Regions:
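Feature captures hydrophobic
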Residues: 1-78
Length: 78
């Protein structure tokens, strides 16, 4: 995770009380999210859907479903 993103994760952990380690973003997860963001922007023809889809995936991820499975689900609805 780059420095800028790491600082935001630190701040979010402080404010929410979430364990900081839960906010770590692996390179693989970052790639999955960036791919999903690109998919949302291109598939919907609206760039604004990219961060919104990533938010929805993040909320869905709290149920414990792996990120790659969520990505497959999102892509299969296109």
């Amino acid at each position: 995770m780059n420095e800028w993103l790491s600082q935001r994760a630190d701040a979010l952990a402080r404010v929410t009380g979430v364990d900081r380690s839960a906010l770590e973003l692996s390179d693989e997860d970052a790639e999955h999210l960036l791919d999903l963001a690109a998919h949302a922007a291109h598939d919907s023809d609206a760039r604004t859907n990219a961060p919104l889809l990533c938010y929805l995936v993040g909320v869905a991820r709290t149920a414990g479903t792996p990120l790659d499975q969520l990505g497959e689900t999102v892509r299969s609805t296109s």
